[in-house]
Amino acid sequence: MSQSTATYINVIGAGLAGSEAAYQIAKRGIPVKLYEMRGVKATPQHKTTNFAELVCSNSFRGDSLTNAVGLLKEEMRRLDSIIMRNGEANRVPAGGAMAVDREGYAESVTAELENHPLIEVIRDEITEIPDDAITVIATGPLTSDALAEKIHALNGGDGFYFYDAAAPIIDKSTIDMSKVYLKSRYDKGEAAYLNCPMTKEEFMAFHEALTTAEEAPLNSFEKEKYFEGCMPIEVMAKRGIKTMLYGPMKPVGLEYPDDYTGPRDGEFKTPYAVVQLRQDNTAGSLYNIVGFQTHLKWGEQKRVFQMIPGLENAEFVRYGVMHRNSYMDSPNLLTETFQSRRNPNLFFAGQMTGVEGYVESAASGLVAGINAARLFKREEALIFPQTTAIGSLPHYVTHADSKHFQPMNVNFGIIKELEGLRIRDKKERYEAIASRALADLDTCLASL
């Protein structure tokens, strides 16, 4: 397919990702047609017609460079992010986090984009993928059915799908490896899972805690997606004392290794129950809890799941969530610039690409917007270093295992490890990673 000869770029959706993409394109001197259906057609979760509206929390999370999202925000500031700039201008006290006056912030983003001389705001619902120009689609996790159908067809009918559950992901370095063992069920293939065995007593206590834990409330627009095919672990537990033993905690084929010295029920060779952890990234620094999609409150997840042997001190880089969410099979469909592999004139941004969170969504819009502009100018694509947060996030979502791909927040586990350095102190290690990231980003920008 040849490159479009249009004199403008389309951006569909004016959430965090679309707003950022539109600004980055216009900043580079290219006219933008920014489409937003709110004002013509409402959504269940938005309360206003403002751009970049925050529909849940007003927090952009931690602001320290020893926090991965704090590093990402600093990188975005250096890239002149409209979301970060207006967030700073509307900041409210929140301790070590960055929180904003949600209305003032959204109003200021809206005003800046509406008053930009190169941005034409069009309040209308888009139901077809435009073929008149380079286009960035940033329509969010609740993309309208009509447009979702078109994206589904574009991707061959199998690359755009609904998924409403995600299991917690933990930092491997915080797992007590003395209490777990590496094994695949029935020893099929390579030993690929970390197994957390439970005695009957441990399982009964865990079951009791799980069935009495407090769940997060569902929004009205989410209830329809609470279905049998993706049952939360706490719902499964409430169906019977042994239901989980025939599901994600099934011990069959996961016998203790000969050198196992932890607690066990008598001389049994197989644990009473097993929780499996599966590697979640290519670096092997992140593991998810297999089959543990959940809608428990985050504090309850930490309390209950830290009862699992080996996870007593586990750090969660992402808690489990249960919500309606549409996102793409990005590892098969997108490049690291969020460009479609099947239609090079098309970019995607925001949660539909598999990034999770306000800041991450805006960051994906920044990357997509810059690269849409570079494509328009027939310049080489800009891929940020994997040593940076803004480089590692698109790398993760476009190189993850497609079969088990789930949305991801930015975290230090997906950023390239330090080379030639082994820093035991976590704070010092994160500081070193952040220092390297900012230096590498500055070098990258200086070379442009």
UniProtKB/Swiss-Prot annotation:
Enzyme Commission number(s): 2.1.1.74
Keyword Cytoplasm: yes
Enzyme class: transferase
Annotated residues for binding of FAD: G13, A14, G15, L16, A17, G18
PROSITE patterns to which the protein is assigned, alphabetical: GIDA_2
Keywords: Cytoplasm, FAD, Flavoprotein, Methyltransferase, NAD, NADP, Transferase, tRNA processing
Cofactors that this protein relies on: FAD
Catalytic activity of the protein: uridine(54) in tRNA + (6R)-5,10-methylene-5,6,7,8-tetrahydrofolate + NADH + H(+) = 5-methyluridine(54) in tRNA + (6S)-5,6,7,8-tetrahydrofolate + NAD(+); uridine(54) in tRNA + (6R)-5,10-methylene-5,6,7,8-tetrahydrofolate + NADPH + H(+) = 5-methyluridine(54) in tRNA + (6S)-5,6,7,8-tetrahydrofolate + NADP(+)
Chief place where the protein resides: cytoplasm
InterPro entries: FAD/NAD-bd_sf, MnmG-rel, MnmG-rel_CS, MnmG_N, TrmFO
Disulfide bonds: none
SUPFAM superfamilies: FAD/NAD(P)-binding domain
Name assigned to this protein: Methylenetetrahydrofolate--tRNA-(uracil-5-)-methyltransferase TrmFO
